[in-house]
Each structure stands twice: as C-alpha cells, then as structure tokens.
Amino acid sequence: PNYPGHGLPVTQFIKYDVNDWWACVQEAYQFLKEEGYEVINAAGVSLGGLFTLRLAENVELNRIVVMSAPSEKTEAGIAWRLEKYGKRMNQIMRLSEDESVESLAQIDQYQDEIKVFQGVINDIMSNLHDIKSTARILYGGQDEAAYEESAHYIFNQISSDNKSIQDFPLNQHLMTHGEGRDELEQDIVEFFTQK
C-alpha cells in the first residue's frame, strides 16, 4: 500500500508528513508481530528504503533490501523531488496549466515538513552502525549518481556481517518499475529465500 498522501495530488499530499508515513511502517511491523511472525524481512525503494533502514535500526529484522535510498538530501533537493512528483500527478490528472501552477505553488507551504524530513534522513544515516540484519543494498544504473554514492555509503556504514551491494544497470530511481524490473524481482526473491 501507498503511504498516506502518496499517489494523490500535491494539495492532498501535503496534508501528511514523514511522521505519518513512519507510523504506517511501525503499524505494519506490529501487525506482523501480533500475527505471530518471528522472522520478518523488509524491503523498500527510496523513502521505503530509508524506512527499511530506520526499522532495522530499531527492531530485529532477518533480512533487508534497500533500494535507491538517499544518504543525504538538501531542502532544495527534497522540494525539487516533490515538485517533480506534483508535475507527474498533475499530468495524470489532466489538470490545466493554471490548475497545475496553483497546485505546485502549495509546495511552499510544506517547507517545515521538508526540514523535518531532512532531519529524519540525517538521523537514519547517523545510526546505520546499529544495523546487524543481513542486508542487500541496490541502486539503479539509470538513476542519479548521488544514489550510487548513497548505496556505497550505506553499505560501508551498516554493521552487518552479511551484506552485499549491487547496481542494476537498466533500472531507474523507482527500481521496481520499468526496464530491469524482472531481474530485480528475481534477485530479491532469491535473497529473501536463501537459507
């Protein structure tokens, strides 16, 4: 499932923040524990990758897969990504040019939340040494170079004795979509089913 606000126009997206999304992750983990699962794996792309790391810093996970996770983001970089998301959603919704401009202007009201999000990224990165789970760190060869650098940073900082890193040359930022997806999915399935 999407995090609250994700997949919605910017006007609705900005009603939520990183704390709402993190609460969803915690609820999902708690649900699995209450259902009796003792061996829990986690995987995530981008924001989901960050939350996979954060979860592994705070609870015992068997295996983790982290894809396209940033090790740092400037406020301007976060705002740019939100604007890019907003433009894509506005196209999907077929908003007029005026409606799109009005929608994107609301990103300015989200600056406090952007600062909080930046702080969460910094906090996650400063606690990577707490991660002991078996880990697979992945990045797309068609993504921005910063994500390859982030993958190597994360790989080098986690304390896991059993960790690996790999690029998927055909994949873009959202690695689970588009070209290279099938190979990626096979890799993840094999990783999670290893004994």
Place the predicted regions along the sequence by residue.
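Active-site signature of alpha/beta-hydrolase-fold catalytic machinery across serine-
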Residues: 54-55, 153
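The alpha/beta-hydrolase serine catalytic core
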Residues: 69-134, 141-149, 161-162, 166-167, ...
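Gly/Ala-rich beta-loop-alpha elbow adjacent to hydrolase catalytic centers
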Residues: 44-48, 52
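C-terminal alpha-helix
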Residues: 187-195
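Catalytic nucleophile-loop/oxyanion-hole region of alpha/beta-hydrolase
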Residues: 9-37
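Conserved alpha/beta-hydrolase
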Residues: 1-10
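Conserved alpha/beta-hydrolase fold motif
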Residues: 39-42, 64
